[in-house]
Amino acid sequence: MTSRVSRLDRQVILIETGSTQVVRNMAADQMGDLAKQHPEDILSLLSRVYPFLLVKKWETRVTAARAVGGIVAHAPSWDPNESDLVGGTNEGSPLDNAQVKLEHEMKIKLEEATQNNQLNLLQEDHHLSSLSDWKLNEILKSGKVLLASSMNDYNVLGKADDNIRKQAKTDDIKQETSMLNASDKANENKSNANKKSARMLAMARRKKKMSAKNTPKHPVDITESSVSKTLLNGKNMTNSAASLATSPTSNQLNPKLEITEQADESKLMIESTVRPLLEQHEIVAGLVWQFQGIYELLLDNLMSENWEIRHGAALGLRELVKKHAYGVSRVKGNTREENNLRNSRSLEDLASRLLTVFALDRFGDYVYDTVVAPVRESVAQTLAALLIHLDSTLSIKIFNCLEQLVLQDPLQTGLPNKIWEATHGGLLGIRYFVSIKTNFLFAHGLLENVVRIVLYGLNQSDDDVQSVAASILTPITSEFVKLNNSTIEILVTTIWSLLARLDDDISSSVGSIMDLLAKLCDHQEVLDILKNKALEHPSEWSFKSLVPKLYPFLRHSISSVRRAVLNLLIAFLSIKDDSTKNWLNGKVFRLVFQNILLEQNPELLQLSFDVYVALLEHYKVKHTEKTLDHVFSKHLQPILHLLNTPVGEKGKNYAMESQYILKPSQHYQLHPEKKRSISETTTDSDIPIPKNNEHINIDAPMIAGDITLLGLDVILNTRIMGAKAFALTLSMFQDSTLQSFFTNVLVRCLELPFSTPRMLAGIIVSQFCSSWLQKHPEGEKLPSFVSEIFSPVMNKQLLNRDEFPVFRELVPSLKALRTQCQSLLATFVDVGMLPQYKLPNVAIVVQGETEAGPHAFGVETAEKVYGEYYDKMFKSMNNSYKLLAKKPLEDSKHRVLMAINSAKESAKLRTGSILANYASSILLFDGLPLKLNPIIRSLMDSVKEERNEKLQTMAGESVVHLIQQLLENNKVNVSGKIVKNLCGFLCVDTSEVPDFSVNAEYKEKILTLIKESNSIAAQDDINLAKMSEEAQLKRKGGLITLKILFEVLGPSILQKLPQLRSILFDSLSDHENEEASKVDNEQGQKIVDSFGVLRALFPFMSDSLRSSEVFTRFPVLLTFLRSNLSVFRYSAARTFADLAKISSVEVMAYTIREILPLMNSAGSLSDRQGSTELIYHLSLSMETDVLPYVIFLIVPLLGRMSDSNEDVRNLATTTFASIIKLVPLEAGIADPKGLPEELVASRERERDFIQQMMDPSKAKPFKLPIAIKATLRKYQQDGVNWLAFLNKYHLHGILCDDMGLGKTLQTICIIASDQYLRKEDYEKTRSVESRALPSLIICPPSLTGHWENEFDQYAPFLKVVVYAGGPTVRLTLRPQLSDADIIVTSYDVARNDLAVLNKTEYNYCVLDEGHIIKNSQSKLAKAVKEITANHRLILTGTPIQNNVLELWSLFDFLMPGFLGTEKMFQERFAKPIAASRNSKTSSKEQEAGVLALEALHKQVLPFMLRRLKEDVLSDLPPKIIQDYYCELGDLQKQLYMDFTKKQKNVVEKDIENSEIADGKQHIFQALQYMRKLCNHPALVLSPNHPQLAQVQDYLKQTGLDLHDIINAPKLSALRTLLFECGIGEEDIDKKASQDQNFPIQNVISQHRALIFCQLKDMLDMVENDLFKKYMPSVTYMRLDGSIDPRDRQKVVRKFNEDPSIDCLLLTTKVGGLGLNLTGADTVIFVEHDWNPMNDLQAMDRAHRIGQKKVVNVYRIITKGTLEEKIMGLQKFKMNIASTVVNQQNSGLASMDTHQLLDLFDPDNVTSQDNEEKNNGDSQAAKGMEDIANETGLTGKAKEALGELKELWDPSQYEEEYNLDTFIKTLR
């Protein structure tokens, strides 16, 4: 069965295959847009999306639900009684009357049927369940549960269900067997054909499973519902409708008819567009809710045993019910009361089913923090969507059922144990109920019930139940607090007691409980209750007692809990009542400070810091009795100890001293008397959960200082934030305390042997100064003691930066360096044979160690070993060893150098961080020092070299502070130099700012293309990568600093820093009008740098700066875009593009007006190159922001895709490929604000062109200006419209309609029309452009006559010359060429006489069967590509036969460069597509293949048009292909077996040596021998045959002739087939007729046959051995290579016109192309082409327009031979070919071409692999079981892991089940 994938299907498949969620969502949203544009196709769209709701992949189901929601949102609400409300009897149109008549008759039929008890729709509701009958106890007692998978995967049912399982298994086997029989049955007469071994069944099962997994989802029939079935079962319903359909009224303006005007105005072509099979559904289409079918399918799936199907069904119902609950089950013809009742019953039935799922579902997915029950969550959302549409009575019933689910009263359920999953489901239902129907709860007094349920849930032992219970009240706390105080008090008491109990690390519910508590504490009512309780029980209920209960959760293992407790602390701090702040003390400060030091999560680290700052601020405001320094008196020292713990390097960690870590009063241990349990649930995982895992120490790596595990940045960031928090704390201390602390503690940190304390002390001092100055009035100075204490130490080290000691943290790197030095010395001894005594002594102890002395090993020692010592030792080596030892010594020496550089780098980074913070501090407490250089150098070094972003940003802030101080002190020159250096940092990365001197030589090249090829080449260069990394770091530092500078100085920055304006604009303005050739390297680099700086700084500029300084200079930038130097054009293009990303309207308006016209500048290559390069960079930098402007770019790009310059061509096509895929999205984009009016109008004009290009159905109808003698069908007129569109815009294309649809006729129409229009224009204008030019048709030689005949038939007014025949014939024809309108020639002639044909320019150059030029390297392809023509057109039924590369060759003829160079195409498309064909490729490679295929499809989409016969010809009879098997004859069998035995080993060896040409040749010869033998033994028995004598003996013994028909079973089979067709019947009954003395002869046979063979010899045997000997009455003709190509059309014509000719004998090569042989209705292949496309084309000679009979195709195949195997494979290939070639194009609406490429789709290839495996032996079949999957696992491990279906990560669950987001969708 062939896979059929239209463009719409491709769009739908993106729901599953999209590489990111953004892509998948976009695909889903486009489904909604399609539904909006084509509401009549809503059901069709839904049927395609529906299967994706039920797949295994989570994200696919969710995206499919989104698509369903988008589709149904655009369907009108269904109210069949709407007209009941409208009075009046206005007369309508005949169509309206017809509809009224249909409805009236329908009503009568309904009433009649009801009276006869045949149809009573109301009584059909008996299967619906009601809430009154919903009994929880019965449901739970039934024993039925819904787990993760069905009973086929797990034995979950009791003994009672054994029979069901057995029956299911039996049905499975029956189904598989029947499938096997149907597909593999070769010959009905062979009794053993249906007998299948167990192995075959197992293989079939696997194959079925694989194909199920790999084939695209087929649309599902969602139109059929119980209601529509009931309606259709009414008597005479169809007849009634049929009679109505044929009534006169229904023919008026009938939308089911296509009417096509013809050139001859007296004719109209009228065609039916609706197939009869669809008529039946249309009878009831307007009588039933259109979604009834899908609604019922989803209802059935809601109770599926597979959780994925349940989940998908719930999602689908949710989307359906949101808008369309009102329409469920309503039927036209019922009264409103009846419909209301039906609707109410159906919705009640849905509610009861949802509740049942709550009760029975047991599936849960454990994600990090909690369990998520996706089925129950989605069912709860569906219930919420349903509740909006239900009345009060049903809502109360649902609430009561949910309450039963939660409480599970044992008296009611009769079960001793409660089922927590049912409770969980009930709570989820109530959670959504509460959010949706808040007012309803108050109106019916249900809020107290809700509270009771919440309290019940909170008191359960299951975390998941507690978590949902807590979340129920969170959205309605403001309503809840209005209840009586006792209820609030109970809840608050419960929550605090829970927090006291939930003290283990796996309590996932803590976060939800804390969120609820935080919300409650926002309300004064709750605070009042807490105050009152505090007065009564101060020790228990004051905030001072309550808040410490939260402390243990600060370091909880679950991040959401840590976040919740921090948010709760902020909530408590924001309470306005001062009396609630009595819990602020030293302990909470210290615990939160520890949180900062220990937190690895960046978001929570920042939140911890914010909480700490809030604590300080509130303490300062509220507490006056105790100063902050008093509070910190006991905590300052321990905090500083922890903060100053050194941060080591890999190989040496420094752990925090645990005695300084304060633990909260409540520890992490479980109470010995109770242990909590995780909720037991069914999950896909069998991973055991270890016991006693309650405490997880998440802080262990941080406490241990584990650099390897955490990375340097994670640890450093916590210390930097800690230092900032510490500094902030100190800024609130009293001066006396500060002075003492600075003198006795902090200043000593500056002299510690570790670098970390020194750096952090620097940060503390600088941040302290900054905080202190912010807290005090402007102008007030820092206390003098700060400068006195720190200034001497810091200044000394800044002035003597080289006098730093070697820090202890550097010891590991020095030890590693020493090891490399020792290794070098050892190499001298081991390889260089140097005596030990000649080696220098290297100290064992390294600098930095505690015992290190003055002679300890350091970097200096290593440098001596590397240089001085190395040279001495090498000289002293024996000469005989020098050569041998040179390579090992150089390697070892290089490793020493690498280690030296590494050690220096580490030391430099650490000293740099220290000095930068010292410099920052001195600037703050001393102001500008006299010696600025040490300060500037330290800060700038940190900006350009610091790897930690926080430290780099702090250095940048200090540089900006320095610039401010310099400006205040009028030191403009110094500040200007700093800014100049910062701008220099932006230009060091040559990937961003090119090097002028290197690129100045390029003038007629596009630099973008050069840089891209260079970047690919440089990827593997390690040195370049390191330099690039350093340049990027420097650029990043410059950007950070300049961004801060722009923020601080604002719009006045260019006034305050004139040097910056100069850097930005002066060099551009100075050289604006200067010739590029006169610019020297220095000036050129300045210009390039200006562009680079402008690009980088533009995003930081204010709007006023942009308007006044940048937009006014666009003309200056434009001069450089037009420069003759590539580097200037590149810089200007990138600058424009980056500016457009920020200010799109201004830049794009200028681009459209001033720059796009340059793309058509024929006289200036630099204009075309610059403008094309700009568009390329616009598409890259703007990404989807370019959407509103895409419409302006397409046409100029199309023009440049055929540019004479290769670089322009390549870049234009690359750009076109990237933006063409955005065109479908452009239509929905509003005009950008501020876009000038004339551009808005222009956009509409451009859109008209684009719409025609992307959707030929929008192509303007082309009325033929001349009378073509043919009647065009609708689709043919559409094709001509498309060809006319291509003609108008000078585009070229491929018309690849299915064979037999009239490609020739459509081509004649456009050629003849254009010829006429050009002639008309020439007569008016005498323009050279419209002078008369002939058109050239190049086709296979057998079709030259066919084209001549077609032109004579349809356009006889055109003079046609067939330039074909031998050289002498062609010589006589050459004089006629100059006068011809049409020249028809063959490919061979075109190649041989290219010089003759090239003398003429052509209007059209048409390649018929254009796939012949698929090999781009062939002389033929190269020849036709040299022909000059205004328009190029390829006609082919099969544009791709084997390889996607063939498509490149076709487009290289049409538009050279459109698909890039062949090499580029290979890299971008062919390789990834080919790689994805291998079933063993990774999922990443598979996706790359799919994306490449999709990208290629989108790029070629506008230039290929394909329609299929079955889609455009409703009157074309079917084509039936059958295999006809025959056994080998005895002689053939003997020869075949002898050959295979002897040749098998030889062939095997040849296959091993298949790279050798001779080996390949031998294999081919062997295959050809076997192939010929299968046809006839005479074809192989040459005089040289080794067994000739044996054969002759055999023939003598049997008395047979070699050419006897007994020796040729294929001829016997052919005779039998012909007899069955009624051909040659006279020969059977000849004897009988002679006896009766009168002849039995039919002049015309019932059937006529085309008989195809590969070889002319085989045709001879059919003619001589069969027809002449055994079937002399058969009349026949022959068409093979011996017939002159010019005479072949005569043979065709005679055969078609003379029905008494029974058979036409053809060779596939000659008769398989382009010919119209509709006179035959039977096609018989005696021999077969190994390329299935050729056979496919051959059989379509008969199956084409004009054929009135069913076409039967017979393939005669010899059983048990190579032929059968090859044909089995070919049969598979034909399936793929069918996928590729016979794909529907959805008419012209999608102009689809991807089906032509689907041969390269991974899905199809997998099928091929399976087919080949099934042909293998049992070992191969067995091996299938154990192929490693993408995880690398096989066997049972693979199966086990395979059960773990892919779910989303927690963040995606949060997104899908976010209550607030969901509620918004309902409103």
Swiss-Prot record:
It is an enzyme of class 3 (hydrolase). ATP binds at D1297, D1298, M1299, G1300, L1301, G1302, K1303, T1304. Pfam families: DUF3535 (PF12054), Helicase_C (PF00271), SNF2-rel_dom (PF00176). GO terms for cellular component: mitochondrion; nuclear chromosome; nucleus; transcription regulator complex. HEAT repeats lie at residues 289-326, 445-482, 541-578, 1108-1145, 1188-1225, 1495-1537. A motif (Nuclear localization signal) lies at residues 195-211. Its main location: mitochondrion. GO terms for molecular function: ATP binding; ATP hydrolysis activity; DNA binding; helicase activity; TBP-class protein binding. It is found in: Mitochondrion; Nucleus. Changing K1303A: No ATPase activity. Residues 169-228, 1802-1822 are annotated as: Disordered. Gene3D superfamilies: Leucine-rich Repeat Variant, P-loop containing nucleotide triphosphate hydrolases, Tandem AAA-ATPase domain. A motif (DEGH box) lies at residues 1408-1411. Residues 1284-1457 form the Helicase ATP-binding domain. Residues 1639-1787 form the Helicase C-terminal domain. Residues 181-203 have a biased composition (Low complexity). Keywords: ATP-binding, DNA-binding, Helicase, Hydrolase, Mitochondrion, Nucleotide-binding, Nucleus, Phosphoprotein, Repeat, Transcription, Transcription regulation. It comes from the Eukaryota. Its EC number is 3.6.4.-. GO terms for biological process: negative regulation of DNA-templated transcription; nucleolar large rRNA transcription by RNA polymerase I; regulation of RNA polymerase II transcription preinitiation complex assembly; regulation of transcription by RNA polymerase II; rRNA processing. The modification Phosphoserine is found at S93, S677. Forms a complex with TBP which binds TATA DNA with high affinity but with altered specificity. Present with 6560 molecules/cell in log phase SD medium. Belongs to the SNF2/RAD54 helicase family. Regulates transcription in association with TATA binding protein (TBP). Removes TBP from the TATA box via its C-terminal ATPase activity. Both transcription activation and repression require its ATPase activity. This is TATA-binding protein-associated factor MOT1. It comes from Saccharomyces cerevisiae (strain ATCC 204508 / S288c).
